[in-house]
């Protein structure tokens, strides 16, 4: 693939055009030794606790653009935190680009070790994946990243010993299994001991009973549900948080009976009193007497949550009739290959069949199915006034995804900056999602690596894309949040459970002299971005919900305007037989990975009640502070272009796209506000943060449609014409006589 696109540099004897050697000749390196030395001495700024492991000099970082090859000469280094290239940023490749949206932790030439997806070596123009010990070392290194960057390094002019050292070091530190305590996370925490900022003033962390009580009061759920501390110190279960919420009649002994399994745990309460609950499956038993004990236990739990004042319960078994983790993993592996492009030629070679490849990956359909299931759950909560109980083996994957999606759609608070971050803390971090395994940070099991959280962010992006004014944060916020999964200075996404975090951070240490380590959370955005860059994370078009006085609040306490006109279906109870079916062998078999064949084709349509609910909602004007439903028809589910296409220059629209529209809207809003201030003659009446255009957006004609990540990327000089269509246009001479044709890529 690399050779076909002309990426093969030195050693390319078959290439008809000049190879990379013709641009950087060995004699130039020797005659300009002083200049090269000066370029190589770019300072490597190490983070606290970061250690240099290996390095190589006279490495060329290059990009491939059809017939031209441009590169930077510098050093390639590997630390216990990242791979970094130190070169002359003023070279022709960057062309004087200003980096306004700069990450303070990760530079443009830095790759966190956890962000490396695959490493390839180029041998005689053939690209091969690199694993373990090598007998022969490549002349080029190609690194595919989990944030979908593709970086090329030429090692042709590097000393042989340095090549062996840097290649072996990178392979070892990015692919070898690791122990948790050997992660850079702990080195950094020890080096900055006690200096971590506390973001609790804005984001609810849900690590104290007070936080849970506050959430119960906010959602009016405190009448039927209570906060319990039976697991304080993780005495009952290391899978659950120290504090959580259960139905009020539930006894502590019930929680202890099966180590927190088989217990309905509260997620969120609807304005009409119904609630979203989740439950993990009981242990698999073969003995009939043990199964009978489990059934009796569940019968008692079911009766507890099925009698007044609790609503009727509908169970949703996510393991038998929804997505499997294997399906998500397989689909994303196919999907991401569409964006890991090695060259411009490769991009155009796949252009004609791109949509077919996109469809065959199934990723967009998985997103649609998640949104559809969330709508069906919402219909039960909102229209049928039923409690919904989500069932899953550990209640820590698809339960997290669907419960979070439902809350984003139903609760306007979860669409605010702090509300969304608090939601992730509650449902994902405290909910026990296995970030360490699902992101494969320790490289111990590739089978466990499943992008469930990324799938959630992609679903939220669909909502942000369809209803921009409803969210206080932007798609850029979601993009950098997805990137933060692989930055090991934040504890948020590097543990499988609160118990694992507290244990390894020393909070359960019996040594009185041993102080627990303190880590940053990802929610302290000042660690990564300056205030100017942070303005791009907040939506200037978002308007806060107006506060009502007491008289107004009484009249609209439970129903917001949109739902008053929706048909309410009579509540129907779930038959008991359906409840017990989930915790037996049938549930366990599905939880262990049984693939559901042809589920995509059989689940295209919403159920009748949900379809009526969905159509009624979309027939009325949108209340951005009320219930929010996405369009889920095929064409409405789109590719998250900013995240997936941001490193591909050919996929950009220079001076166009949504960023241009946003720039014009902000200019109009600023003008209107200026006129209002002049009329009222109150120049300092209030700060205009929410309507002030970030300076970078003022000249949108200079920006890319994939701003702010691709603002100054060099665009290919080649005519925008797929290479697969060249043969149909005749020979090369005939093609040269034709005028260039412009093909509009449109909205991806």
From Swiss-Prot:
Coiled-coil ranges per UniProt: none
GO BP terms, alphabetized: phosphatidylinositol dephosphorylation
Residue ranges of the region described as Disordered: 549-576
Subcellular location: Cytoplasm; Sarcoplasmic reticulum; Cytoplasm, Myofibril, Sarcomere
Keyword annotations from UniProtKB, A to Z: Cytoplasm, Phosphoprotein, Sarcoplasmic reticulum
KW Phosphoprotein (keyword) present: yes
GO CC terms, sorted: cytoplasm; membrane; sarcomere; sarcoplasmic reticulum
Functional note: Acts as an adapter for the myotubularin-related phosphatases. Regulates phosphatase MTM1 protein stability and possibly its intracellular location. By stabilizing MTM1 protein levels, required for skeletal muscle maintenance but not for myogenesis.
Name of the molecule in the record: Myotubularin-related protein 12
């Amino acid at each position: 693939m690399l050779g076909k696109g002309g990426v093969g540099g030195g050693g390319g004897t078959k290439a008809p055009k000049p190879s990379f050697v013709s641009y950087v000749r060995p004699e130039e390196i020797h005659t300009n030794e002083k200049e090269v030395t000066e370029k190589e001495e770019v300072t490597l700024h190490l983070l606290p606790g970061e250690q240099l492991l290996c390095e190589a000099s006279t490495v060329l970082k290059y990009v491939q653009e059809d017939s031209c090859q441009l590169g930077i000469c510098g050093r390639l280094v590997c630390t216990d935190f990242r791979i970094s290239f130190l070169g002359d940023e003023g070279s022709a490749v960057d062309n004087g680009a200003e980096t306004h949206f700069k990450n303070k932790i990760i530079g443009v030439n830095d790759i966190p070790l956890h962000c490396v997806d695959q490493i390839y070596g180029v041998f005689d123009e053939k690209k091969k994946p690199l694993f373990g010990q090598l007998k022969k070392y490549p002349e080029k290194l190609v690194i595919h990243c989990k944030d979908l960057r593709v970086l090329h390094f030429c090692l042709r002019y590097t000393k042989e010993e340095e090549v062996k050292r840097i290649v072996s070091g990178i392979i070892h530190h990015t692919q070898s299994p690791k122990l948790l305590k050997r992660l850079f996370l702990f080195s950094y925490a020890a080096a900055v001991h006690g200096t971590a900022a506390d973001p609790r003033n804005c984001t609810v962390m849900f690590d104290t009973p007070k936080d849970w009580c506050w959430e119960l009061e906010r959602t009016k759920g405190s009448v039927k549900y209570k906060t319990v501390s039976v697991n304080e110190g993780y005495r009952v279960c290391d899978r659950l948080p120290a504090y959580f919420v259960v139905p009020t009649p539930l006894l502590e002994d019930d929680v202890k009976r099966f180590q927190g399994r088989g217990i309905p745990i509260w997620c969120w309460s609807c304005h009409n009193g119904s609630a979203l609950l989740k439950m993990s499956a009981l242990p698999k038993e073969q003995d009939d007497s043990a199964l009978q004990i489990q059934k009796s236990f569940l019968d008692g739990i079911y009766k507890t949550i099925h009698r007044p004042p609790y609503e009727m319960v509908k169970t949703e078994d996510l393991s038998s009739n929804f997505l499997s983790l294997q399906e998500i993993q397989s689909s994303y592996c196919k999907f991401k290959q569409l964006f890991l492009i090695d060259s411009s030629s490769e991009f155009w070679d796949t252009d004609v069949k791109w949509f077919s490849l996109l469809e065959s990956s199934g990723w967009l359909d998985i997103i649609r199915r998640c949104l559809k299931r969330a709508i069906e759950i919402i219909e039960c909560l909102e229209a049928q006034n039923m409690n919904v109980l989500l069932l899953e083996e550990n209640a820590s994957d698809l339960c997290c995804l669907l419960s979070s999606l439902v809350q984003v759609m139903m609760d306007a608070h979860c669409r605010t900056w702090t509300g969304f971050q608090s939601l992730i803390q509650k449902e994902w971090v405290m909910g026990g999602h296995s970030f360490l395994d699902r992101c494969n940070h320790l490289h111990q099991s590739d089978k466990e690596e499943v992008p469930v959280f990324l799938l959630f962010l992609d679903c939220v992006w669909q909502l942000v894309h369809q209803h921009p004014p409803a969210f206080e944060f932007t798609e850029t916020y979601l993009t950098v949040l997805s990137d933060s999964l692989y930055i090991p200075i934040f504890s948020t996404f590097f543990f499988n459970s609160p118990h694992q975090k507290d244990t390894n951070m020393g909070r359960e240490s019996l040594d009185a002299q041993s102080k627990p380590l303190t880590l940053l959370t990802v929610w302290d955005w000042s660690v990564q971005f300056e205030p100017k860059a942070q303005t791009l994370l907040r939506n200037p078009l978002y308007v806060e919900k107006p506060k009502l006085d007491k008289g107004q609040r009484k009249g609209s306490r439970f129903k917001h305007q949109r739902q008053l006109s929706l048909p309410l279906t009579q509540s129907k109870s779930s038959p008991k037989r359906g409840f017990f079916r989930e915790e037996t062998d049938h549930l366990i078999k599905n939880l262990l990975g049984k693939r559901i064949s042809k589920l995509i084709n059989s689940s295209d349509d919403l159920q009748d009640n949900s379809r009526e609910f969905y159509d009624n909602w979309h027939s009325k004007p949108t209340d951005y502070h009320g219930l929010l439903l996405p369009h889920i028809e095929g064409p409405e589910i789109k590719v998250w272009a900013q995240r997936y296409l941001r490193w591909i220059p050919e996929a950009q629209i220079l001076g166009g796209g949504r960023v241009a529209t946003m720039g014009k809207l902000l200019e109009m809003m600023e003008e209107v506000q200026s006129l209002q201030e002049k009329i009222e003659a109150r120049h300092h009446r209030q700060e205009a943060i929410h309507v002030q255009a970030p300076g970078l957006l003022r000249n949108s004609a200079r920006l890319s449609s994939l701003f702010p990540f691709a603002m100054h990327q060099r665009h290919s000089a080649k005519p925008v014409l797929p290479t697969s269509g060249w043969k149909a246009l005749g020979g090369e001479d005939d093609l040269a006589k034709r005028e260039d044709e412009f093909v509009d890529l449109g909205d991806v």
